[in-house]
C-alpha cells in the first residue's frame, strides 16, 4: 500500500537506490497503489555512475509491498519492504536487470518484460 511521500527501494540496475512516491497514477482521487500499479517517483538516492540522477522524475511500477497481496485462493504474499522498478515514457523498464522476487500479479501484457527479467516469480 503505497501513497504519496512513501519511500521505496529500487529493484533494478538503473543506479537509483531509493525513490519517493510523488503521485499515484490512475484517477484524481486515487490514494493508494499496490503491486502492479504505476506511480510517479522522484530519485532520492542514486549511485554516482548510474543511469539516473538524484532529483529526476520517473514513472515506476510497484513490484513488492510490505502490506501484501491477497490471492483468490486466500493466500497472502508479503515482503519485507516496498520496491519499485523505474520505467521510461513508454512504460518499459529502464534497467536491464531486476533484483529480488516479483509477484505473479505483474504478469500482464504491460509488464511481461519485468517478469522475464526477474530471478524469481512468486
Curated annotation (Swiss-Prot):
Keyword annotations: Ribonucleoprotein, Ribosomal protein, RNA-binding, rRNA-binding
Keyword tRNA-binding attributed: no
A matching Pfam family: Ribosomal_L14
GO CC, alphabetical: cytosolic large ribosomal subunit
Signal peptide range in chain numbering: none
GO molecular function, one term: large ribosomal subunit rRNA binding
Keyword Ribosomal protein: yes
InterPro entries named in the record: Ribosomal_uL14 (IPR000218), Ribosomal_uL14_bac-type (IPR005745), Ribosomal_uL14_CS (IPR019972), Ribosomal_uL14_sf (IPR036853)
BP terms from Gene Ontology: translation
The protein's assembly and partners: Part of the 50S ribosomal subunit. Forms a cluster with proteins L3 and L19. In the 70S ribosome, L14 and L19 interact and together make contacts with the 16S rRNA in bridges B5 and B8.
Family indicated by similarity: Belongs to the universal ribosomal protein uL14 family.
Functional summary from the UniProt entry: Binds to 23S rRNA. Forms part of two intersubunit bridges in the 70S ribosome.
Protein name listed in UniProt: Large ribosomal subunit protein uL14
Organism: Albidiferax ferrireducens (strain ATCC BAA-621 / DSM 15236 / T118) (Rhodoferax ferrireducens)
Gene this protein is translated from: rplN
Amino acid at each position: 500500500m503505497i501513497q504519496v511521500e512513501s519511500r521505496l527501494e529500487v529493484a533494478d540496475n538503473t543506479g537509483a537506490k531509493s525513490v519517493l512516491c510523488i503521485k499515484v497514477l490512475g484517477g484524481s482521487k486515487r490514494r493508494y497503489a499496490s503491486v502492479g500499479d504505476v506511480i510517479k517517483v522522484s530519485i532520492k538516492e542514486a549511485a554516482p555512475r548510474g543511469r539516473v540522477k538524484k532529483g529526476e522524475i520517473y514513472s515506476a511500477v510497484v513490484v513488492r509491498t510490505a502490506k501484501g497481496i491477497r490471492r483468490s485462493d486466500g493466500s497472502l504474499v508479503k515482503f519485507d519492504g516496498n520496491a519499485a522498478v523505474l520505467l521510461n515514457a513508454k512504460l518499459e523498464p529502464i534497467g536491464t536487470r531486476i533484483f529480488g522476487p516479483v509477484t505473479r500479479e505483474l504478469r500482464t501484457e504491460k509488464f511481461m518484460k519485468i517478469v522475464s527479467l526477474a530471478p524469481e516469480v512468486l
